Amino acid sequence: MNRKETRKVKVGNIYVGGDFRVSIQSMTNTDTKDVESTVKQIKELQEAGCDIVRCAVLDMDAACAIKDIVAKINIPLVADIHFDYRLALKAIENGVSAIRINPGNIGSREKVEAVVKACKEKNIPIRIGVNSGSLSKELLTKYGKPTPDALVESALEHVKILEELDFHDIVISMKSSNVETMIESYRIASQKTNYPLHLGVTEAGTPWRGTIKSAIGIGTLLAEGIGDTIRVSLTGDPVEEIKVGKEILKNFGYVKEGIEFISCPTCGRTQIDLINIAKEVEERLSSCKKNIKVAVMGCVVNGPGEAREADIGIAGGKGEGLIFRKGEIIKKVKEEDLVEELIKIIETI
C-alpha cells in the first residue's frame, strides 16, 4: 500500500506521519478526575493494541489529575481541550504528550500564543480537530451546511493561526458522521497540506452501525494512501474501538500480528454447530499475537479447498470435523473436541 508521505510528528514515543506505521487511537469515557478508573481503562486500551489515548479535560480538576494519570501509564496521552486555554497550559505542565484544540475557539491571540509557547517548550504537538457539528457560523453561512470544503477551510484556518506563530508540529482531523463528507474532506485536505491526517468518522454509532461506517470511511481513505493515524468512534466500551481499528489496518497489511480469521456463511451442507464453533474459536484466539490465518469451514466437501490459503483450520462433517493445514487434512476429530484440538495445534505453531 503506497501512502502519501506527510510530515512526521512525535507524540510521546510514537511517530505519526512520514513513513511510520498507521497508529491506532481511542478516547477514555471515564471521568478524568477519577484517576483510578481512567488509568484502568487506559491500560485496558493499551493491552488491546491502542497506541495513543485521549482524555477529556473539562475543568481544572481534570487538568490537575493528568499529572497522576501520566505517572501511572506508559502510553502517550492527549488532552482534549475546548474554550479555556488555561486547561491546555495545566495539562501540558502535567505531562501530556499532545493536545487537541481548535486555536480559533480558545480566545484571543495572546491565549493561543501562550499555548503554542508551552507546546514548543515541551516539544508537544497540537491536533487540530474539526467536526461537522462545530463549524463557525461564518462557514455555515458561506456553505449552507457542513460540506467537505467547509470542513477543510475550517481546518486550514486553524492551521494558519499556528503557522503564523511558527508552529508546525500539527496533526489534522476533519470528522463528520456522514461518511461521504468525511471521505471527501480528507481527500481535499490531502491535496492541500502535508500535515499528518488523523482519520475517523465521528459519532459513528453503536458497534454494529459504527463498525460499518468506520470501515467504509477509514478503509476507503487508507486504500487511497491517505491517513497516518485512526480512531474508530463507537458508542460503548472503547476497547471495541481498538479491535475494529486493528481489523481495518490488518486488512490493508498495516498490522501484521494477530489472527486473520475466516469462516464460511454456512449452507444446507453444514452438519455441525458451525456458528457457535466459529464464535468460540474467534474468542479463544482474540488475544493471540501469531501472524496466521485460521479458517472455520462448514463442510468437508469444499472446506479444505476453499480455505487453502489458511495456515490451519477445521472443516465440519456429520458430528465430526477435519483439521487441516495449508489445505491438507491432518486429523479427524469429534465435533465436541474440534475447538480444543484446533487451539492445541495453533499453540504449537
Swiss-Prot record:
Manganese found in the keyword field: no
EC number: 1.17.7.3
Annotated binding of [4Fe-4S] cluster, by residue: C264, C267, C299, E306
Alphabetical GO biological process terms: isopentenyl diphosphate biosynthetic process, methylerythritol 4-phosphate pathway; terpenoid biosynthetic process
Keyword field: 4Fe-4S, Iron, Iron-sulfur, Isoprene biosynthesis, Metal-binding, Oxidoreductase
Catalytic activity: (2E)-4-hydroxy-3-methylbut-2-enyl diphosphate + oxidized [flavodoxin] + H2O + 2 H(+) = 2-C-methyl-D-erythritol 2,4-cyclic diphosphate + reduced [flavodoxin]
Pfam families: GcpE (PF04551)
Any one GO MF annotation of this record: 4-hydroxy-3-methylbut-2-enyl-diphosphate synthase activity (flavodoxin)
Cofactor: [4Fe-4S] cluster
Top-tier EC class: oxidoreductase
Protein's pathway: Isoprenoid biosynthesis; isopentenyl diphosphate biosynthesis via DXP pathway; isopentenyl diphosphate from 1-deoxy-D-xylulose 5-phosphate: step 5/6
Similarity remark: Belongs to the IspG family.
NCBIfam families reported in the protein's UniProt record: ispG_gcpE (TIGR00612), PRK00366.1 (NF001540)
Name of the protein in question: 4-hydroxy-3-methylbut-2-en-1-yl diphosphate synthase (flavodoxin)
Species of provenance: Clostridium perfringens (strain 13 / Type A)
Taxonomic classification: Bacteria, Bacillati, Bacillota, Clostridia, Eubacteriales
Gene from which the chain derives: ispG
